[in-house]
Amino acid sequence: MISVTDIRRAFLDNECHTITKAFGYLHEDKAIALIKIGFHPTYLPKVLYNNVVEFVPEKLYLFKPRTVAPLDLISTITKLKNVDKFASHINYHKNSILITGDKSLIVKCMPYMIISDDDIRFIREQFVGTNSIEYILSFINKESIYRMSYQFSENEIVTIINRDHFMYEPIYEHQVLDSDFLKTMLDRYGIVPINSGIIDELCPEAIIEILMAVVRPRDAIRFLDIVNKNQLTEDSVKNYIINDIRRGKIDYYIPYVEDFLEDRTEDLGIYANIFFEDAIDITKLDITKTELEHISKYMNYYTTYIDHIVNIILQNNYIDILASIIDYVQDVLTEELCIRIVCESTNPVPVTSLPIHSTLVMVMCIQMKYVDIVEFLDEIDIDTLIEKGADPITEYTFTTRWYNKHNDLITLYIKKYGFCPMMMKRLMFEYPLTKEASDHLLKTMDENRGAIMFFPRTICTLPYLLCCNYKLIQKPIPFKEENRNIVYKKNNRVLCFDSLENSAFKSLIKIDSIPGLKTYNMKDITYEKSNNIICVRFIPQESIHNEERRIKLQLFDIARLASYGLYYIPSRYLSSWTPVVNMIEGREYTNPQKIECLVILDLFSEEFIEYQNLGNAVSNKYELEYTISNYQAAINCLMSTLLIYLVLGSIRSISRTENFVLSILNIFYKGLKINELLSEPVSGVCIELNKIKDRASSGDSSFIFLKKNELSKTLSLCEKVCVETILDNNQSFKSSK
């Protein structure tokens, strides 16, 4: 349980109405300790500034921009890849950032700065050369474009749009463009020429051709707004738009229809009532299912005919359509119809729109995995919800007032997330708790210290363990005396590094000192410094030609190196998958969407990071919003690596999948020197891996896309292995398992 004793004391002693207010009364040391673990309000008092700068500078965004010193800001954001949280601070200190002349820093900050014409002139003076200014300007934001008079070149426009497609909108509003360029952009990028530069090129045929390319209602409305009215009255244009409306593109043409099609209501058919009040008696029409689907969004224009529409829906069993207009048909909904809507409609309906909140309807919602089950609390007590297997604690619940209405819901939240700084921060500092609800929350947490509320199941889950202050054991790397009497052949390789402090060089030297590695392809390493360059010479290891054996031994090496504090980041296979982040934020995670490479490649020293630098390295590699701990980053590395070697290894394996999986797990444990044996069957894992293997074998792609939850059993296995790794590294905790 997160310790809130000091916060509770401050809350009571100072008669605070919010927990945020109480946080401001904490002693600085106590406050900084909580800030370090990510447990803090959405803003901090000035008194904590110096301590935050010293101990957790990445949290400077919690102060108002004017409070943050420019040098402190620049020093901090220079080290971070993801600076989204500093957006207002970056813009506030724009001049200080531009004056640095640091191109990479300016590029990083461009999306957040409101750039003026004077700023562009300054940047041009700082960075001479067309390519430099074009590259820097490609990161500009739309707010800047709306405020400047600078005219972008066509090359600059293409570069900007290549980086962010939707930047076409402010650019096209900003300046008149050549018609040939506009046509090219339409053909190449599908960008509608909403620019006065196209007006002279328009004719009815061109207007229709452009409308055929429109994919956003806003673009259609804005394009028609610049077209000459005489051309909009052409019959060919009218006929095309009427047909487009009948195809369901209603939002695209609402202003146009009201201005130009008042005399064509009969041609519009059932859709006419959307634009003109009760223009058509729809009871005289033969209404199709497609038309009902199209008008369901606009049911407020058909209230006169609701009974007629409902009769058609029920006669034809169109439950999906009934669900889409549920707020207009409350009087006809029985318990049976509510259950049918819940079970048969493609999209979930809001629980608040279901007029009957019976236990049976609730059970059906639970089975269909509704996220707003909490709304049944208006009729059903929380114990019944839990008894029936409901989880009323979801993202949706934060959008309601239920936490202030039910103290039992807060208690349930604490049982689920009381160990998690991120999730408790959301409820305590970001949700508008009343004074009474805040008091209950602090009292419950303070009176249930330790892990008492999380026994017996939660304490052995990976999300719980990731939020605890545990460590992974690092064996000391043995000293290896350098051998200078090695005879190198001419074809032996040489690697060069810029300094002895280069992280890849340091990893290489440490790897060379670790005994028992099987596949690392460098041996007999020596190095010397020459002209400020570090030259490393080595003899390549002999290749292992048996692919399955190579994969297994390589995983052993990765695990062995991890046991010595050198961790492998498999980002070349998984470019954006960070399951640990989801877990520490209390969110569900699924398998990665894509594995970038289907071949297990050789290992290189630059892919291994020392444990003490791992949190920063992983956070920057994946451009996270905040820096995770070294411990959390290590588990992310181990889990990702194990998943990759299970999936890609099984694709390459010629053994029975079950034998391969068990072998991989044993090798992984052996490399980490963990005395564990898997006690559960892996048949479900094998089924998943075999499906992936069949799919990969039938294609010739160098990568593979994965469906959501396609590897749920495999992920569960990886999670359990990580749990065993943590427990083995923290024996005192393991005894409570």
UniProtKB/Swiss-Prot annotation:
GO terms for biological process: microtubule-dependent intracellular transport of viral material towards cell periphery. GO terms for cellular component: host cell. Disulfide bonds join 496-535. The modification N-acetylmethionine is found at residue 1. Induction: Expressed in the early phase of the viral replicative cycle. Keywords: Acetylation, Disulfide bond, Early protein. InterPro entries: Poxvirus_E2 (IPR007585), Poxvirus_E2/O1 (IPR021155). Interacts with host KLC2; this interaction promotes IEV trafficking by engaging the host kinesin-1 complex. Interacts with protein OPG056/F12. Belongs to the orthopoxvirus OPG064 family. This is Protein OPG064. It comes from Vaccinia virus (strain Western Reserve).
